[in-house]
Amino acid sequence: MAKITKEAALLYHSQGKPGKIEVVPTKPYSTQTDLSLAYSPGVAEPCLEIEKNPQDAYKYTAKGNLVAVISNGTAVLGLGDIGALSGKPVMEGKGLLFKIYAGIDVFDIEVDEKDPEKFIAAVKAIAPTFGGINLEDIKAPECFEIERRLKEELDIPVMHDDQHGTAIISSAGLVNALQVAGKKIEDVKIVVNGAGASAVSCTKLYVSLGARLENIVMLDSKGVISKTRTDLNEQKRYFATDRTDIHTLEEAIQGADVFLGLSKGNVLSQDMVRSMAPMPIVFALANPTPEISYEDAMSARPDVLMATGRSDYPNQINNVIGFPYIFRGALDTQAKAINEEMKIAAVHAIANLAKQPVPDVVNTAYHVNNLSFGPEYFIPKPVDPRLITEVSCAVAKAAMESGVARTEIKDWDAYCVHLRELMGYESKLTRQLYDTARRNPQRVVFAEGIHPNMLKAAVEAKAEGICHPILLGNDEAIGKLAEELDLSLEGIEIVNLRHPDESERRERYSRILAEKRAREGFTYEEANDKMFERNYFGMMMVETGDADAFITGLYTRYSNTIKVAKEVIGIQPGFNHFGTMHILNSKKGTYFLADTLINRHPDTETLIDIAKLADKTVRFFNHTPVISMLSYSNFGADTSGSPVKVHGAVNYMQKEYPELAIDGEMQVNFAMNRELRDAKYPFTRLKGKDVNTLIFPNLSSANAGYKLLQAMDPDTEFIGPIQMGLNKPIHFTDFESSVRDIVNITAVAVIDAIVVKKKNESR
C-alpha cells in the first residue's frame, strides 16, 4: 500500500467541493410543478399521512434508508479525545463507506457533549429523523452505557461499530481459523490483550459463539484481569479470571490457542508466539502497528494463523465487511434493534462466504490468480460483491425470526436481485440474459481452454447453470492449470483436437469444409491442415451440430478469426457483411453501440447492413431500437467525406423501413440530448424519442468511443463484442477480456444458439 502523506490527505479532503459527501435530490425539480410538489403546498399531504400513522415516514421520506453516524469525538481512531468537530472527517468517511458499500445515505452528526446523560438526550431528540444510528468513536467506559440506554429507549437499530463491528468480523475470522486449525471453540484457550470497547465486545461475542469464560484471560494496561483486583469496572469484572498464577502477557500466553490483540504495537514477542499451542491463531489488530508484525509472527513459527487490521497482509479484520450490510438488512426490515441474533447471523454469513469460490473481480483486485479458503484466506475481502447479498439477507432473516422486524421480506431471490441492482453489480438486462440461458443451457465451445480467464469463465458458466462447457486444449495442461487455480472440472468436457483419438472427427470436418468451399479453391488437404487449428475445429463443431456455440479471441487476432468465421460459418442470407455490437448498461439506461470490431472503413452498403443488423439485435434483447447514425456533421451540413456515406445509408433505411426510428447523420451530443436535438432539428424522425442505438461511421470512432466510456467510468457494465450477422453463434472476446466479460458473452451465445435452433425447427 502506497504511503499516505500529510499533503496528499489534506489535498484529498479540500480539493473541489470540500469534504466527502453531499445531498442529492431523488425527485424531479426542474419545473414549478415539481417544486410545488416537493415543498409547499404539496408537501403537506405526506406530513398529514405521517401524523396519522408514524410508520408512513418509511413510505414518504428517506427515513428508511438514512443512518446517523453520531460521535462526540472522545475516541477518534488513534487520535484520542480531539473533540466533536475535529472528528468530522472521520464521520464523513464513515458515511462514504455506508454509501459505496450498501447504498445507505448518511448524515454525520458531531455532538459537542461529553456528559453521557446529555449526549443520550441529544441523540434521542433527533432519532425520529433516522432509520438507524451508528455510534462512532466514543470512549470507554461511557460508550457501553450510552449504547445500552439508546438501545433500550429507541425503537430503531442502534450500534456502536467500534465495539460490534470488530467483534463480528473477528468472530467470523475466528470461526474459520478454528476450522483450518481443526479446533473447537469450546475447547480453546483465549488470551485477549486489551480491555477497551472493541476487546470487550469481541470477547463477549466469542462467548455467544461457544467460548467458555473459564478459558479466557483478558489483560489491560496493568496486566491480567483477575478477581483479586479491586480496580475493575463492570465490563472487566465479567472477564476476571480465577487464576492467580499468571500476571503478565508472557505468562498468560503459554499454551494458548488464540491471541486477540486490541491494544498497542509490538507487545507480543516471537518467543511468546512460540510458546502457544500448535497452529496458534493470532489476531494482532492494533493499528497501524500490530501487536506483532506479520513477518515476525510467520518467522517465529510457520503454522500460525494470523489476521491483522492492515490491508497489506492476508486476513484483514476490516469493519467495512460488516457494518454496511448489517444496517442494510436492519433497514430493509424496518428493524427495531440490532440484536445478538442478527450479529451472530452476520458472523456465520461472513465466515461461510470465505469458503466459497472467490469471484474473479476479487482476485484481480488483489493481483492473485485464485484465492481459496485456508491459512492465508479465511476472511472475505472488502471488495467481494457477494457481501451485500450474503450478509444483508442473513441479518434481515435474523431480524424477522427474532421478532424485531416491522416488515417482512417474502421473496428472497427478488431481494437479492434488488441489492445487486442497488449497487450496480447487476443490470436487469444481464439478469434476463442469465435467466433465459439457465432455462435452456446449450453446448458452448471455449477455444482457449488453457487460458486462465477462459478456464475460469467456463467453470463459472457451468456453476451459473447457463451452459454445458466444452474446452479445447490438451487434457493434461488444462488439468494442471485447473489444479493451480483450485478449480473443479467436474461436468466439463475437454476436447484435445490434436490427439489421435480425434482423427476421425478431423477427417469428417475436413471433408465437409472442403465440399462447402470447393468452388473457392479450398482443397481437402488444406481443410485437413486447418483442423489442427482451434478456430477451424471449434467452428466446425458448431457447423456440424457437435456443439451449439463457439467463443474465441483471447489468443487470436480478430482479422484471422473473422476470416475463419466467414469461411466456415458464413454470413446470413440477405446480408453481405456482419458486425459486432457492445451493450452499455449505465444509470441512464441501456445503450447499443455498433459496429465496434469488424468493419474498419464501411461504405454506404456496409453501413446499411450494420444498421439492419443492429435493428435485429436490439430487438433480440427485447428493446425497441431508436437509432442514431453518427458523424461529425448534422443532417447534410457537410456534403463531402464520410458524412456522405452515412447520409446515404440513412436515406436508404428511411425509405425501405419507414416504420423504423432512425435518423442522421448527426453528432453524438445531438444524438444523446433529446431536447437539444428537437429544438435545433424539429424535422428529425427521432423527435421526442431517446436514442438507445448508436451506429458509428467507422471502426476508429466506434472503438475509441466505447473504450473512452469504459475508461471514464469503470463501474459501467459493457457486454460485448456481440456478433451480428453470421449464420451460427460464433462470438468473440479479446486479450483484455475479464472472466466476467467472457461469462456475459457466454450467456449471449447460449441465447443466440436457442434462437438459431428455433428458426431451424420452424423451417
Q: Model-flagged regions — what are they?
A:
Residues R237-L305, R310-D312:
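Rossmann-like adenosine-cofactor binding region
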